[in-house]
Curated annotation (Swiss-Prot):
Function: Has endoglucanase activity on substrates containing beta-1,4 glycosidic bonds, like in carboxymethylcellulose (CMC), hydroxyethylcellulose (HEC) and beta-glucan. Involved in the degradation of complex natural cellulosic substrates.
EC number, UniProt record: 3.2.1.4
Protein name: Probable endo-beta-1,4-glucanase B
Substrates-to-products reaction catalysed: Endohydrolysis of (1->4)-beta-D-glucosidic linkages in cellulose, lichenin and cereal beta-D-glucans
Keywords assigned: Carbohydrate metabolism, Cellulose degradation, Glycoprotein, Glycosidase, Hydrolase, Polysaccharide degradation, Secreted, Signal
Name of the top EC class for this enzyme: hydrolase
């Protein structure tokens, strides 16, 4: 799916890691997306504090205090590497991104680096696996000493050749490992917006992905409105959550894979509360393959957005956190 007022100064990534927080939750991971640095996608590069913002470490700390232990941090490739995927960094943007990652991992939680690009760079489908490998080799090299960083290959590939989606994911894996980042998990995403409900029909070929470190996690997204887009506060039924992840659960089991729901949400209403609770209960019954889930989304600039998980007054933080609490650490 689809913000701090001062520029954050980054610490070195290697110095910003603590031991993973101990979990009382049934899941290995449970947390939230942290949105803002990908805002203003129609204004590139845009200005910090005007078109985009970075997540606020203080509100992330509040969510950690509630028991969350994983945060998916959105950013745009075009802002990080403005000239080309293989080019030099915008050092200020990298510093801000690194600061957020450091704040998360110093607290013992996991930070997912999420290039929120939909398989595209400057509006064009990424077609060069070599360039994509280099992008990831360069970025992973910045965080290779921080084992609480997770690399998400790209957000929600869509309307792309299926073999290309496979090859881009494999190129990212190869680049990350070539950088010497060998301890971190890699989250791979699929075509058709990485939807769990379409995964079996669309993304079966991704079972061929390989990783010498055997730390691939299949990241799927699932919304509960009629078209699965997450653009409505309504949910189709009280049982739609479980129904939309059942086939993907079987696929994970049949293929010896593990997965995570990288985005989910529903409106603050009784039907969605029941549907989300049912989905999470089902995932919790299948933790051999489901390692957790992340709400969409927190972030400083969401305002009155229907799924806003930003403390202290976001609609979902106020109206949905209680149904997530059984799964928090």
């Amino acid at each position: 799916m689809k913000f701090g007022s001062i520029v954050l100064i980054a610490a070195a990534a290697g110095s910003a890691v603590a031991a993973p927080a101990k979990r009382a939750s049934v899941f290995q991971w449970f947390g939230s997306n942290e949105s803002g640095a990908e805002f203003g996608q129609n204004t590139i590069p845009g200005s910090y504090g005007k078109e985009f913002i970075f997540p606020d470490p203080s509100t992330i700390s509040t969510l950690i205090g509630k028991g969350m232990n994983i945060f998916r941090v959105q950013f745009l490739m075009e802002r990080l590497v403005p000239s080309s995927m293989t080019g030099s960094y915008n050092e200020e943007y990298l510093a801000n991104l690194t600061s957020v990652v450091d704040a998360v991992t110093k607290a013992g939680s996991y930070a997912i680096l999420d290039p929120h690009n939909f398989g595209r760079y400057n509006g064009q489908i990424i077609s060069s696996t070599d360039d994509f490998k280099t992008f990831w080799q360069n970025l992973a090299g910045k965080f290779k000493s921080n084992n609480l960083v997770i690399f998400d290959t790209n957000n929600e590939y869509h309307d792309m050749d299926q073999a290309l989606v496979l090859n881009l994911n494999q190129a990212a894996i190869n680049g990350i490992r070539a950088a010497g980042a060998t301890s971190q998990y890699i989250f791979v995403e699929g075509n058709s917006w990485s939807g769990a409900w379409t995964w079996v029909d669309v993304n079966d070929n991704l079972k061929a992905l390989t990783d010498p470190q055997d730390k691939i996690v299949y990241e799927m997204h699932q919304y509960l409105d009629s078209d699965g887009s997450g653009t409505s506060e309504s949910c189709v039924s009280t049982t739609i959550g479980k129904e939309r992840v059942t086939a993907a659960t079987k696929w994970l089991k049949d293929n010896g894979k593990v997965g995570i729901i990288g985005e989910f949400a529903g409106g603050v209403n009784d039907q969605c509360r029941t549907a989300i609770s049912g989905m999470l209960e089902y995932l919790a019954q299948n933790t051999d393959v489901w390692k957790g889930a992340l709400w969409w989304a927190a972030g400083p600039w969401w305002g009155n957005y229907m799924f806003n998980m930003e403390p202290p007054s976001g609609a979902a933080y106020v109206g949905m956190l209680d149904i997530l609490e059984p799964y928090l650490g």
